C-alpha cells in the first residue's frame, strides 16, 4: 500500500476547467464511495475548493490507483481523460505528503499564507470520516497535516506574506490617485492635518487579521473600486479597500453566486463579467485577480470605457498570474497600471521570503518525521508477531518441562521459567530493536520482510497494532 495524490489547481488548469472539477459537499460522499469501491483504493479524501480539486488515497498499486483516480476525475469534470491528463499532477509517497503539508500551510495557494485552506482541508477530512472512507493511513496523514498547518500559522508570519502583496498594491494605487486627485482627500477619520502617506502606511500594513483604527484621511475616501475575481485575493482586496475608505465597491466574477458571497461580506455590489466594461468606465481603481488563462481586460475595451470620462485618472492593480490586464493600457492617457512586477520592486520581499522559507523548512522536517513514523509503524506488526511467536514457543516448552520436572516447588519453578523468558527476550532484543531502526531508512520495509522470512511469521498480521500488542514492541 502507498500514498497517492492526484489533482489539478490554479497553476495547471484554467478557471473554466476548475469550475467543472469542483465537487460540492453534497456530491462528495458519492465520489468518495466510488473511489474506494474501485479496484485499487482502500482510503480516499477529496479536497475541492475554488482553486483546486485533489484526491488523496491509499492505493494497492501506483498505476492501478492512478488509473482509478484519473478516471473518477474525468467523470467529475465531464472531460475525456485524454484532454484532462495534461492538467493533472501526480504525487507519490513522500511527495504526496509534502504536497499536502504545503497546501495546508498556504504555500500552494494563489494568496500565499492564506488561512482559509486550513479550514477547507479540515472540512474535507471530516467529510471523508463521515463517509467512512478513511481510518488508518490517511487519517494519520490528515491529522498530522492539520497540526503542521497550525504550526505554520502560529510559529511564523506566513499569514502576512500574501496580505503584503495586496496591501502594498492598494497603497501604491492610493498614492497614485491622491497625487492626481486631491479631491479624494475629503473624509477625515479622526484628526485632520495628518499626512495622507502616514494614513496609508498605518492602514494598509500587512497585519490584516484585525481592524486598525487610523487617524487622518482615509486614503481611498470616496473612490469607486471595481474588483474582478471573487477568490481569496479578491476577497482580501475588497476587505482592504473597504478599510481604506473606498466608496462604491463592485465585485465582478464569472460565477454570480461567488461574486454575491464576497460582495455581501464587504458591503459591495455584485455584477457579472459582461458588465465589466461599464464598471471600468465608472471606477477610479480596478483590481483584478481572476486566475484566467488569458487577458480579462484589453486595451481597446479600456479605451472605449474612457470615453466621456474627462481627466479623471484610472488605476489598474493587476494581482493575477498570468496577468489579467493588457499591459498596453499604460499607453492610454490618465491610466496607471500596477502589476506583479511593479509590486515585487516595491515590496520588501526579504521578510516575505524569510517567512516562506521558514514554513518550507517546517514542512521538510514534518515530512521526514511523518515518513519515519510511518516506516516504523509498518514494522510494528512484524515485531508483534515475532514476540507473540516467541511467547507461544516459551509457553509450550515450559508446559512440557513442567510435566518432566514435577518435583520442583513454586520458587524453583519461577526461577526456571523466569530464566527461560529472560534468555528469549535477550535473544530477540537486538534484532527487533535493529529492525525498527533500519525501518526508518528508505527501503526499510525489506528488513521486516526478511524477519518474517527468517522466523516463518504469518503474513496476515494486523495493519493497526492494538495497545496490548504495542507493549510487546515497547519491551524491545
Swiss-Prot record:
Keyword Oxidoreductase carried by entry: yes
Query: What catalytic activity does the UniProt entry give for this protein?
Result: (S)-4-amino-5-oxopentanoate + tRNA(Glu) + NADP(+) = L-glutamyl-tRNA(Glu) + NADPH + H(+)
GO BP terms, alphabetized: protoporphyrinogen IX biosynthetic process from glutamate
Q: What positions does UniProt annotate as the active site of this protein?
A: 50
Record-level Gene Ontology MF annotations: glutamyl-tRNA reductase activity; NADP binding
Reading the lineage from the top rank, the first entry is: Bacteria
The EC number(s) this enzyme carries: 1.2.1.70
Which UniProt keywords are present, listed alphabetically?
NADP, Oxidoreductase, Porphyrin biosynthesis
Its annotated pathway reads: Porphyrin-containing compound metabolism; protoporphyrin-IX biosynthesis; 5-aminolevulinate from L-glutamyl-tRNA(Glu): step 1/2
Q: Which PROSITE patterns match?
A: GLUTR
The signal peptide stretch is none
Disulfide pattern: none
- Residues holding NADP(+): 229-234
The entry marks the following residues as binding substrate, namely 49-52, 109, 114-116, 120
Tell me the function of this protein.
Answer: Catalyzes the NADPH-dependent reduction of glutamyl-tRNA(Glu) to glutamate 1-semialdehyde (GSA).
Subunit structure, interactors included: Homodimer.
Give the UniProt family note: Belongs to the glutamyl-tRNA reductase family.
* Additional facts recorded: During catalysis, the active site Cys acts as a nucleophile attacking the alpha-carbonyl group of tRNA-bound glutamate with the formation of a thioester intermediate between enzyme and glutamate, and the concomitant release of tRNA(Glu). The thioester intermediate is finally reduced by direct hydride transfer from NADPH, to form the product GSA.
Comment field on protein domains: Possesses an unusual extended V-shaped dimeric structure with each monomer consisting of three distinct domains arranged along a curved 'spinal' alpha-helix. The N-terminal catalytic domain specifically recognizes the glutamate moiety of the substrate. The second domain is the NADPH-binding domain, and the third C-terminal domain is responsible for dimerization.
Name of the molecule in the record: Glutamyl-tRNA reductase
Amino acid at each position: 500500500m502507498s500514498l497517492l495524490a492526484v489533482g489539478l489547481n490554479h497553476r495547471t488548469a484554467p478557471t473554466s476547467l476548475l469550475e467543472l472539477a469542483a465537487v460540492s459537499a453534497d456530491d462528495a460522499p458519492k465520489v468518495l464511495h466510488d473511489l474506494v469501491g474501485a479496484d485499487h483504493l482502500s482510503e480516499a479524501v477529496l479536497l475541492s475548493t475554488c482553486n483546486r480539486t485533489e484526491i488523496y488515497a491509499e492505493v494497492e498499486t501506483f498505476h492501478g490507483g492512478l488509473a482509478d483516480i484519473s478516471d473518477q476525475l474525468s467523470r467529475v469534470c465531464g472531460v475525456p481523460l485524454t484532454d484532462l491528463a495534461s492538467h493533472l499532477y501526480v504525487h507519490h509517497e513522500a511527495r504526496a505528503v509534502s504536497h499536502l503539508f504545503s497546501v495546508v500551510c498556504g504555500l500552494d495557494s494563489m494568496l500565499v499564507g492564506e488561512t482559509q485552506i486550513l479550514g477547507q482541508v479540515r472540512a474535507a477530512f471530516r467529510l471523508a470520516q463521515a463517509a467512512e472512507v478513511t481510518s488508518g493511513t490517511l487519517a494519520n496523514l490528515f491529522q498530522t497535516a492539520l497540526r503542521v498547518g497550525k504550526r505554520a500559522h502560529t510559529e511564523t508570519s506566513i499569514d502576512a506574506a500574501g496580505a503584503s502583496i495586496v496591501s502594498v498594491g492598494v497603497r501604491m494605487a492610493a498614492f497614485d490617485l491622491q497625487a492626481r486627485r486631491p479631491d479624494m482627500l475629503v473624509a477625515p477619520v479622526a484628526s485632520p492635518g495628518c499626512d495622507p502617506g502616514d494614513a496609508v502606511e498605518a492602514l494598509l500594513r500587512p497585519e490584516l487579521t484585525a481592524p486598525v483604527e487610523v487617524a487622518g484621511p482615509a486614503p481611498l475616501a470616496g473612490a469607486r473600486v471595481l474588483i474582478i475575481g471573487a477568490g481569496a485575493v479578491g476577497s482580501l482586496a475588497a476587505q482592504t479597500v473597504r478599510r481604506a475608505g473606498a466608496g462604491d465597491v463592485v465585485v465582478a466574477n464569472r460565477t454570480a453566486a461567488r461574486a454575491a458571497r464576497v460582495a455581501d461580506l464587504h458591503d459591495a455590489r455584485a455584477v457579472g463579467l459582461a458588465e465589466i466594461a461599464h464598471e471600468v468606465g465608472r471606477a477610479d481603481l480596478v483590481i483584478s485577480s481572476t486566475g484566467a488563462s488569458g487577458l480579462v481586460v484589453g486595451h481597446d475595451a479600456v479605451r472605449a470605457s474612457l470615453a466621456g470620462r474627462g481627466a479623471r485618472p484610472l488605476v489598474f492593480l493587476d494581482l493575477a498570474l498570468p496577468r489579467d490586464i493588457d499591459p498596453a493600457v499604460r499607453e492610454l492617457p490618465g491610466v496607471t497600471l500596477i502589476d506583479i512586477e511593479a509590486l515585487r520592486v516595491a515590496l520588501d520581499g526579504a521578510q516575505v521570503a524569510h517567512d516562506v522559507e521558514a514554513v518550507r523548512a517546517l514542512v521538510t522536517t514534518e515530512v521526514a518525521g511523518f515518513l519515519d513514523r510511518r516506516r516504523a509503524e509498518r514494522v510494528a506488526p512484524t515485531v508483534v508477531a515475532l514476540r507473540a511467536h516467541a511467547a507461544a514457543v516459551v509457553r509450550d516448552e515450559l508446559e512440557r518441562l513442567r510435566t518432566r520436572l514435577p518435583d520442583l516447588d513454586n520458587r524453583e519453578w519461577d526461577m526456571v521459567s523466569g530464566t527461560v523468558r529472560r534468555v528469549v527476550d535477550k535473544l530477540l532484543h537486538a534484532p527487533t530493536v535493529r529492525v525498527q531502526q533500519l525501518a526508518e531508512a528508505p527501503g526499510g520495509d525489506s528488513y521486516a520482510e526478511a524477519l518474517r522470512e527468517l522466523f516463518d511469521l504469518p503474513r496476515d498480521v494486523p495493519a493497526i497494532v492494538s495497545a496490548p500488542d504495542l507493549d510487546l514492541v515497547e519491551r524491545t
